Amino acid sequence: MKKHLLIGSMILAASVFVAFSVGKAAAPLSPIEELGKKLFFDKALSSPAGQECAACHGPSVGFTGPAERFNKVGGVYEGALKGRFGNRKPPAASYAGESPKLHLDKEGNFVGGMFWDGRATGDALGDPLAEQAMGPFLNPLEQNMPDKKSIVLAVQKSSYARLFEEVWGKSSLDAGKNVDKTYELIAKSIAAYERSAEVNPFSSKFDAFWRAAKAKGLKVETIDAATAKNFRNLGLAEGEINGLVLFNTKGMCAVCHVLSSVNGKPPVFTDYTYDNIGVPKNPDNPFYGQAKNFNPEGKAWVDKGLGGFLETVDKYKSLAAANMGKHKVPTLRNVAEWPSPDFVKAFMHNGALKSLKAVVQFYNTRDKAGAKWPAPEVKSNLNTDESGNLGLTDDEENAIVDFMKTLTDKR
C-alpha cells in the first residue's frame, strides 16, 4: 500500500473550443508564459497545419480531450494526418508541473515523469513537463512534424517570433547548428505556460473550502466521519463533505489522489506514482487498426504502461516485469469540467470509462461477484489494496462523485 510520505519526494523538484477564455481572473502572464501560450495554440506547428497542442488538451475540459466524437468511443485522438491515432487518451496538461523526475522512492515505487508511461523522465532537461512538450510535435501519430528544424522555421515565421527572442535572447531562434537548443527552448516555454496561474488557477469550490479550513487550523487530509463536523460551514455542502470523508476513508481514493498540500498550495490530487487498477481493454481504441509500421501487433496489442517503457531502459529493465500494466496516477482536478452537462468525457488511460460514476463503480466493484466487468488488460501487478471490492453503497458512490465535482476551477 502506498504511503502519504510520497509527498516528500514530490516537493523536489487539440479541435478545441478556441473561443473559450481561460484564466480571466488570473494574474497577467509573464513574457515566457505568454510565449508558451502562443506556441500551445499555434496550429502551424503540425504537418499538415491545423493541429495545435490544445486539440488534445482543451481548456474547456480541464486541458484534456475536448472532442466528444473521440471521447465517446476510443478516447484516443486523431493526429494531424487523418486516420492516424495514438494509443492512449490525452492526459491533463494542467496541474502537472510539480511532477518530479522519474525515480524510485524508498519503498520501491516509481514516482514522477510525464506521459501515462513515464517516458518523459526529466533526465534530459531536468524537467519532465518540458520533455513531454517535445514529444507530440515529432510524433507521426500526433502533430507529425518531420524534424526540429521544420518546427523552428515555423516559429520564425510566426507573429510571436520577436517575443521569442525577447524572452530567450537575440539570435535564440536558430534553425541551424543550434536547432536542438532552440527546440528545448520551445518546450521550456510551453512548460512555463502549463505551469502558469492561467492553466492552474486553484480557483475551485474545493480550493475556497481548503483555504477556509487552513485559516481555522484544520487539515483537510485528516478529515473522517468523526471530525467532519469541524469542516461544516466552510464552503462545501453537507453531501460534498460526506463525499470528501468517503474519498479519504472508505473509498480509499486519497491513498493515491492525495489530499496533502505541496509547497503551501492546495493538493493536486495525485502522488505521481503508477498503478495497475485492472482497467480492461477499450475495444474501440483506434490504435488497434493502425498500420503495421505503427502497431505491428494489431488487435493483439497490449498496453504495458510503465513496464513497457522500463523494458527500453538498461538500468530499469530488471524492474519492468513488476511494473507491467501500471499507468501514472492522474490529477483529479477538473475531472468534471465540461462545456455542457451532457458532454461526454473519457476516463482512464485508454478512455474505457465514460462517466465519473462509472469510474467510482469500477474501483468499488471490480472484484465483486456478479459485477461483470471485463477482464483487466494486464492481469499482473493488480492493485487489490485500494480497489476491487470497497463495499460502497450506491449513495456513497454518488457522494464521492459530488465531491469530485467541487474540483472544477472557476474560469
Task: Give, region by region, the residue ranges found by the protein language model.
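Periplasmic c-type cytochrome electron-transfer domains
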Residues: 17-411
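Bacterial N-terminal signal peptides
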Residues: 8-17
